[in-house]
UniProtKB/Swiss-Prot annotation:
Listed GO biological process terms: diaminopimelate biosynthetic process; lysine biosynthetic process via diaminopimelate
UniProt xrefs under InterPro entries: AcetylDAP_deacetylase, Amidohydrolase, Bact_exopeptidase_dim_dom, Peptidase_M20, Peptidase_M20_dimer
Signal peptide positions (record): none
Family statement drawn from the similarity comment of this UniProt entry: Belongs to the peptidase M20A family. N-acetyldiaminopimelate deacetylase subfamily.
Physiological role: Catalyzes the conversion of N-acetyl-diaminopimelate to diaminopimelate and acetate.
Organism: Streptococcus pneumoniae (strain Hungary19A-6)
Pathway note: Amino-acid biosynthesis; L-lysine biosynthesis via DAP pathway; LL-2,6-diaminopimelate from (S)-tetrahydrodipicolinate (acetylase route): step 3/3
Active-site residues (renumbered): 69, 128 (proton acceptor)
HAMAP family named in the record: DapEL (MF_01692)
Keywords annotated in UniProt: Amino-acid biosynthesis, Diaminopimelate biosynthesis, Hydrolase, Lysine biosynthesis
Protein name: N-acetyldiaminopimelate deacetylase
CDD domains in UniProt: M20_Acy1_YkuR-like (cd05670)
Molecular function (Gene Ontology), one example: N-acetyldiaminopimelate deacetylase activity
Catalyzed reactions: N-acetyl-(2S,6S)-2,6-diaminopimelate + H2O = (2S,6S)-2,6-diaminopimelate + acetate
Length: 376
């Protein structure tokens, strides 16, 4: 039987960023091959650093998919754990080591007997940076294994162990990366009339762009425009010719995201025109669409977990965090949910360390749900 804690700790020590998960893939394949030995109803494919494990059903009417992400983050771990990351500057700070371990545990249970319906276990690379789910879909990595229904989870530090949270609508916001570069004319600080100050224009833009949400977005729907990077100038007595801004747009519907993207671009171009300078606007959403749960399937999942002993189901509001599972759920009906891990540190924090007792709880809960879906 798979040792869940040992498996999680082994994976925790080898975090790798998106599309570079070579050790992670090798470890997963080794475990998967041991679990599936002698199971003639199982097929395995790889796609770059991803893995697809397909269980052929005995009388299949549909294919049920379970997705887990496998990449780490470019973070220096500060947990002090004896099994901390062995990869300098890399950490499983978003719980993907937990996701993988739970998926392996569920796979082990699913292999106890051939399911009626087909089951697909997807170990997806590059959730954090390149929208690996979108890349796999666009590259036809699924082929005829593409699920009819897709499910997945994400751990959540502010929920207690034993709590599962989701809803029947949007769970995660769609996210869009924004890069803006204003191009003016540099000069001496003493002669501003001979220059065209990109820093002033960019500063004006930062204040004006706040009106996009306050005056274009329905307050009930909500959206976020945040610029976390502002780079301009090199010294105190030189007027800079360029100013660079790097930020994010987040919205709970794709229509709202597109509206906000359009307005941000319009404001940037308007400010540039007002200051008689050039501007470059780069908007990159890619596969980070809103995670929109299928209402009927979400209600089914919520009712199932609500009746499980040891599980506290929470009907939760959407989060403004992003998840590339939204892309796959734009192609296939499905559901995502939160799994509580009770950590005082947030996701992406260098000291984030979930409680390991959630592993057994997660495997028991998810595998029982997948068993139900596989038998329908």
């Amino acid at each position: 039987m798979l040792d869940l804690i040992q498996t999680r700790r082994a994976l925790h020590q080898i975090p790798e960023i998106g599309l570079e998960e070579f050790k992670t893939q090798a470890y997963l394949l080794d475990v998967i091959e041991k679990l599936t030995t002698g199971k003639d109803f199982v097929q395995i494919r790889t796609w770059r650093t991803g893995i697809l494990v397909y269980l052929q059903g005995s009388q299949p009417e549909r294919t049920i998919g379970w997705r887990t992400d496998i990449d780490g983050l470019p973070i220096v771990e500060q947990t002090g754990l004896p099994f901390a990351s062995q990869h300098q500057g890399r950490m499983h700070a978003c719980g993907h080591d937990f996701h993988m371990t739970i998926a392996l545990g569920c796979l082990e249970r699913a292999l106890e007997e051939q399911p009626k319906n087909n089951l697909l276990f997807l170990f997806q690379p590059a959730e954090e940076n390149e929208a690996g789910g979108m890349l796999m879909y666009e590259d036809d990595a699924f082929g005829d294994w593409l699920p009819d229904q897709f499910y997945g989870l994400h751990v959540r530090p502010d929920l207690k162990v034993g709590q599962i949270a989701t809803n029947t609508h949007t769970l995660f916001a769609g996210t869009c990366e924004v890069k803006i570069r204003f191009k003016g004319k540099g000069g001496h600080a003493a002669f501003p009339h001979e220059a065209n100050d990109a820093l002033v224009a960019a500063s004006y833009f930062v204040t004006q762009v706040q009106s996009v949400v306050s005056r274009n977005v329905n307050p009930i729907e909500g959206a976020v425009v945040t610029f976390g990077v502002f780079q301009a100038g090199t010294t105190n007595n030189v007027i800079t010719d360029t100013a660079f801004l790097h930020g994010t747009i987040r919205a709970l519907t794709q229509d709202m995201s597109l509206l906000v993207q359009k307005r941000v671009k319009t404001v940037a171009e308007g400010v540039a025109a007002a200051f008689d300078m050039e501007v470059e606007v780069e908007l990159k959403q890619g596969g980070y669409l809103p995670v929109e749960n299928n209402p009927a399937l979400a209600r089914e999942l919520m009712d199932f977990f609500d009746e499980k002993d040891g599980i506290e189901l929470i009907d939760i509001e959407p989060a403004m965090t992003g998840e590339d599972f939204g892309y796959l759920l734009s192609k296939v009906d499905g559901v995502m949910f939160w799994l509580g891990i009770d950590s005082p540190y947030a996701l992406h924090h260098p000291q984030m360390s979930p409680k390991e007792e959630v592993l057994a709880i997660g495997v028991a809960a998810v595998s029982s749900f997948l068993k139900k879906k596989a038998a329908e």
